Amino acid sequence: MVRVATIYVAPDTASEKLGEVDRGREVVVLDTSREWLKVEAALGEERLLTGWILDKGVVQVSTPNGDRILFGEAVDSEDQASRRRGRRCADQDALRLYYRVYDIFPSSPLAAEALYRSADIRWQLEKVDIMSRPSAHEKEAYLREGMNEELMKLVEKKYPGTKWADLAAFQRIDNKLCGDWQGSSKCPEKEADIYEKYVSEHPQSPAVAEALYDAAWRRAALIEIYKTEDQAKKSEESKAKAISLAQKASSQFPQSDWGARAERLLFLIQQGVPTYGNAQD
């Protein structure tokens, strides 16, 4: 569905209304009657409703350019969700519509991107909720509930070697990050290793610049953290690693925001300005 449709008991607008079918909901056509479709509509939470809807705004496998129509409606819904006075629940509409592109048109050139966008919307919505809970501040990642990885893993499984699979793998790093470092070197050290491993395993990913910066920022933070732990040698080693990572991000991605941020980080490190904690001159 690319519109909100009222579902009726009979193929007549004067008949009893059973409910509404939102954008992106799956409908199975059971019968037709002139300009009407008898459908079984999935309304969420395993709720099914059978009735009649007007044959308008229903995209089927046989619909010409159906994948582009669904994708376009998803993009429009995502735009609505980003607006201050946008349509209510437009983010959920976009999530479902993108998924329908993949589900109904798996061979479409838009399918991989659509599945990733659907997964990303779900990820971001869950992340806002999970990170607002007290458990989000726990030091260890396993002490809090993580975002559901099912759709992200599906992207990686169905479209390996694509940039969408690379981006899905990058998003899943969120579930491995500590909530609060609590001034300990364990978390930033582990996280820097994770980002560096990502760069090594996904060298063509659109997220490489960000991953390099994320690793460099954590290595830079360790410069001061190791000092508080009386580990001067490790502090110097972290400084060298941070400089190397920041230089790589800056030189390889000079036109990106991450490249510029890496250049700033490099400047602070070389100037001896702490990038973590409350250290002052």
Where are these regions (language model features)?
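Beta-loop motif signature
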Residues: 1-34, 76-85
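Boundary regions of SH3-family modules and the immediately adjacent low-complexity/disordered segments
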Residues: 11, 16, 40-85, 104, ...
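Short solvent-exposed coil/turn linkers within tandem alpha-helical repeat scaffolds
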Residues: 14-15, 88, 101-113, 128, ...
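SH3/SH3-like beta-barrel fold
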Residues: 24, 37-42
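Amphipathic alpha-helical repeat scaffolds of TPR domains
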Residues: 64-83, 109-134, 161-180, 206-227, ...
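Short coil/linker segments at helix-helix boundaries
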Residues: 79-92, 124-153, 178-193, 221-250
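Heptad-repeat amphipathic alpha-helical coiled-coil interaction surface used
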Residues: 95, 102, 118, 125, ...
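Terminal, low-structured helical/coil segments at or just beyond the last alpha-helical repeat
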Residues: 186-191, 235-281
